[in-house]
């Protein structure tokens, strides 16, 4: 089924963005939803994957939900709205897995639930689909050591350190840096506030003038770091390692301001989540691995492969 009509609805009171697939003649027998954890550009690519899966599956209708303020409370309101509409399956990236486990368990008693991007392993979700974030953190850790062969002090930035994907990436980084000459000063969180994300970096550059590296764990942290470093006139003096494929991050990799970025494959998050939900709703449980995890591998983007990767991402974003 095609996303032949796309509606952007600003929900009063909590500004949740909703992108709806229109119903095909006669109605779809499987209604599923993909719920993000914030409004980052990262999810634009995931939406393309959802749209492609929706086109391929004749009996599926997909709703794509974006909690613009990135809170667990807004995710709950979105889910309640989906349940009221009679949704059959939900793929959600929980903002705060530990404190949302009960919510996920309640939902799982009513409809099929999988987690994507950020897992809640203690919940009753049917499966997790996404990155092995510990492994991705280890990749970032190796890049930090590579960028700082003489060692140095680094600061880590993230939206919410309580999010499982953030915790696991940080765990992987710490494991890899253990015993090295690199010292982690601390982790600064911004609660998905982009202005605060940049000010956290600016404050760090002032408070720790000897800082050698800045690490961003979430997609928008890369541009926040880059812009703060540029404003401080320290491009080239501080090594930047980040995650995901924001435009500014990729441009920074191309011009050398960003050493490298570890990218996920959000298109596959969307595409495979919809297909997985459709198969499970059709009664096929064989698609769930024994460990209940479907891992989508991460990629390392550096100066030598950034042009090719950027061209691919731009195609997915509909830019050419």
Regions found by a protein language model. Name each.
Residues 27, 75, 129-154, 196-198, ...:
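Hydrophobic alpha-helical segments within soluble ligand-binding/sensing domains
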Residues 42-56, 60, 136-140, 164-182, ...:
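Short, solvent-exposed amphipathic alpha-helices that sit
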Residues 97-135, 143-146, 153, 244-254, ...:
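Flexible loop/hinge segments that line or gate small-molecule binding clefts
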Residues 22, 157, 161, 165, ...:
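Hinge/cleft segment of the Venus flytrap/periplasmic-binding protein
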Residues 91-107, 173, 185, 191-252:
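Hydrophobic alpha-helical
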